[in-house]
Amino acid sequence: IEEPSGSMVVDIGGGTTEVAVLSLGGQVYSRSVRVGGDKMDEAIMNYLRKHQGILVGEMSAERIKKQIGTAMAPEHGDGMTVTVRGRATGDGVPNEVEINEKMMAEALADPVGEIVEAGHFRRRSKLRGQFPSDYLSGLGFANLFV
């Protein structure tokens, strides 16, 4: 962080995410958004209800997130899979389904998109012109895993 290049730090908490860029020994940008692990868990629960017809609780959603949660779908195939147990939405009978990383990338697209947006500052007027374009283009979320 002492060099004239930047390092982006993303701290995803339960209720908020902090995004900061550190350079030349200090913080040159920061933003907080009200998106965190809790919203991701909620997104997983909603996805499973809507697309798989199964109801799961918060603890199950968090376990799924930790096992196969990803911001980017695998380049080839569907990625790793896990078995999820819950209750069928129609009759409440215990049920299980197989879900994969590709599904989780889709489920997490909205909350991850909000976090990614917090990291996009190239167009923000207070930073425009302060950094060379290659400095800004080097910052991003290419490998954001939850």
Place the predicted regions along the sequence by residue.
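Conserved phosphate-binding catalytic cores of ATP/NTP-utilizing and phosphoryl-transfer enzymes
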Residues: 1-10
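Residue-level signature of catalytic and energy-coupling elements of molecular machines
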Residues: 11, 44, 119
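Phosphate-binding glycine-rich/basic clefts of nucleotide- and phosphate-handling proteins
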Residues: 23-109
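Short amphipathic alpha-helix initiation/capping segments at coil-to-helix junctions
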Residues: 101, 108, 112-115, 142-145
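Phosphate/ATP-binding catalytic cores across multiple sugar-kinase/actin-like superfamilies
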Residues: 107-134
